[in-house]
Amino acid sequence: GVLDILKGAAKDLAGHVATKVINKI
């Protein structure tokens, strides 16, 4: 459903941001 798609997108975005932050340290 749409909620699943949004959840997946949120997870991908969170993972992307986390990776960026980790790489900055």
Curated annotation (Swiss-Prot):
One GO term (biological process): defense response to bacterium
Cellular location(s): Secreted
Signal peptide (UniProt feature, chain positions): none
Keyword Transmembrane helix belongs to the record: no
Keywords, alphabetical: Amidation, Amphibian defense peptide, Antibiotic, Antimicrobial, Cytolysis, Hemolysis, Secreted
Transmembrane intervals: none
InterPro entries according to UniProt: Antimicrobial15
A cellular component term, taken from the record's GO annotations: extracellular region
Tissue: Expressed by the skin dorsal glands.
Residue numbers of Isoleucine amide PTMs: I25
Pfam families noted in UniProt: Antimicrobial15
Coiled coil, from the record: none
Chief location bin: secreted
Highest taxon listed in the record's lineage: Eukaryota
Purpose: Has hemolytic and antibacterial activity.
Self-association and partners: Monomer.
Protein name: Syphaxin
Organism whose genome encodes this protein: Leptodactylus syphax
